[in-house]
Amino acid sequence: MPTTLYIIGNGFDQYHGAQSSYSAFRQYLLRCAPEVVMAFDLYWGPGTLLNSFEHPRDIEQCLLNNPKNYHHSNWTVDHLGADFERYLAELNREKVMTLADWYLPKIDEDDERFSYAEYFLPIDRIKEQIHHTTFEMRYRFHKWVNMLHYERGFRKKMLPLDSNALYLNFNYTLFLESEYHIPREQICYIHGSRRDKYGSLVLGHSENPEWAFEKWIHQHQNQRRFRPNLKDKKGRWYANDRLTYLSYFLEDKTRGNWRLPIRYYAQEAIREAIEGYYDNSLKRTHSVIHQHQSFFDSLKEVRKIVILGHSLSEVDMPYFDKIANSIIKDQVEWEISYHTPTDINRIHHFCKRYGISAQPTLL
């Protein structure tokens, strides 16, 4: 049985010159599917991009016209370029509800001008945009992975890896096989690989939807705009009619200031779409671990673990929990690579979490 385990992260491919950072993926999206980044600006994150528009038609112009000249919000630049998997858990409920409210018809069902087509259109439009953005992002991500390659001259930098060791690969690339000639049967592609069919790569956020929902409610319930009564510009009080408040913070929905009945039915449909997204975009790590149980069972004889290019991010901690429970910790030597001084701090926190000591090595 192999006694060495290598854990391979994205920094390993970047060390060899692959442009595999999330910021590089963002640049790829801007070239090939800029509308995905635009939609990400509109619906994800805590920013207030909607405040830049006076009318929904301006948003349509944003999404449809001059995509390459589009001005992206700072939030998207910082976070879609840094760790977009984590921020897939940042679909902004308030943004979505506000945008839906803008689109909804402002007349009652009894009005002869009322059209159910106009009622369903904004609901379907927003649901479709959210679905399309997440589907397209997964599809484009897989295409981008297939395009990754090492830079010329990378062989001069190749590392002395043990060809008899086991490999837990968090990357989707096949460079361990193609360039280091590690046998496929010794590699566990924990999130899938580029050879898999499109749409099957494991990609998503790790926050439990129920826990994340309760956290969001707790963070926002005391904010002024979500209080039962608000003041208008003339200082007069009125019952809060914001769709986000009515949908998420009003306990008795029958007493809400809905203005029009269709707003009640619309918020139900939109809320269902939002919460369904959170559940569907969850990276189900425990299910992934179960699928690869035989690999983790094979770690009992491991006496050395080498982590190369992994960020040790929270989203992947369940895998490290499983590793820690699959080995004899006091008999294992750890070696963890770093790239910046910040990485060393992360290594210290990691070691403290698992009660181990590790030798940091520069990659």
Regions of interest found by a model, annotated:
Residues 39-271:
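Extended, H/D-rich, highly charged conserved domains that either
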Residues 1-16, 163, 274-363:
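SIR2/sirtuin-family catalytic core signature
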